[in-house]
Amino acid sequence: MHVRAPWSLPEPTLAYFPNARFVPSDRDLGAGALRLVGEDCPAPTRGGVAVADGPTEPGFNDFHHVPVLAQRCVELLRPALTRHHADGSEAVLVDATIGAGGHAERFLTELPGLRLIGLDRDPSALEIVRTRLARFADRVTLVHTRYDGLASALTELGYGAAQSIDGALFDLGVSSMQLDQAERGFAYSKDAPLDMRMNPQSALSAADIINTYDEAALADILHRYGEERFARRIAARIIRRRADKPFTTTAELVALLYEAIPAAARRTGGHPAKRTFQALRIAVNDELGSLRSAIPAAMDALAVGGRIVVMAYQSLEDRIVKRVFADAVASRTPMDLPVELPGHGPRFRSLTHGAERADAAEVERNPRSAPVRLRALERLELEALPRQGTGKGES
């Protein structure tokens, strides 16, 4: 999910979020809006999932959005979405990270019969996308949930959690809209409350972690999620500093990080706060845990012939996607058998050779695409098929 602002972020922020880039757009985002059920009247909270659908009054900050690898996403997902009808009728696409709706707009425009379900944990993002997609209101349902709430959302909407959709799209990474809102506390280049919650309604903030976790837990978070080699040193400094006064702002934490990280490392390793801020953001929002649950849930929800596309922007996310996809395309039939045992063959086939990267033309058009790693799969029938190149009887 990526949102563009009409002005550039300071370079230190770009060092921390290399996928946050800004490209002029001539798109008219429209004046209508989809209505979030529960905004101005009580709504059922079945399983904690709030459903958004229907018209409402516009309320929109003028953020713009250039979707990453949009054409490639369309190429990969179109065969699954047009299996029933060429215009996408009877097909359902789940955009699990709808953000500002750039990818969703592209699919809804090109496939005028397509039904789209958009998920996002950030109420601000849903405010933006409901305006952008207003002209498609009869074909769009927005759901306020993390992407690991996909199965629950589908169930509550009447689709079911198994083999009920034709496509799933995940555009991982940080929204530059969130970065630009200083009060959210994501950008270390701006002094703001030490928050970092993608969903402001969530209980845990970065300040809670910094001020209450013990030294070992802090070091583990910084090392595991930020791959910070000075994790123990930073954690020890945090414990000493907070004994005098709790941390409340990003500037206070940045100042400590400048002191904790050796000068030589500061000169060569980019901004000293980038790894710590990444680690805290991931921990606050349980980004990796959510992803580990969300990808298998999306794959289970795909009907036979359905497809999933995932775009990751940093190695921790991509490793998770790579492992889940590798397991899905592997056969569970013993290698010495000449045929696949029923129910033991690969459940999916890969549509990409490893991870695809943006080409030079795409990066030139949209610099935010530079770090992207795209992977895609298609769901298969589980049948007994001849083994290729292995097993008994091989000559």
Curated annotation (Swiss-Prot):
Task: Please provide, in alphabetical order, the Gene Ontology terms of the cellular component aspect for this entry.
Answer: cytoplasm
Could you tell me which cysteines form disulfide bridges? none
Q: Which reaction does it catalyse?
A: cytidine(1402) in 16S rRNA + S-adenosyl-L-methionine = N(4)-methylcytidine(1402) in 16S rRNA + S-adenosyl-L-homocysteine + H(+)
Identify the domain of life: Bacteria
> Quick one: which residues bind S-adenosyl-L-methionine?
101-103, 120, 147, 171, 178
State the function annotated in the UniProt record.
Specifically methylates the N4 position of cytidine in position 1402 (C1402) of 16S rRNA.
Name used for this protein in its record: Ribosomal RNA small subunit methyltransferase H
Annotated organism of origin: Mycobacterium marinum (strain ATCC BAA-535 / M)
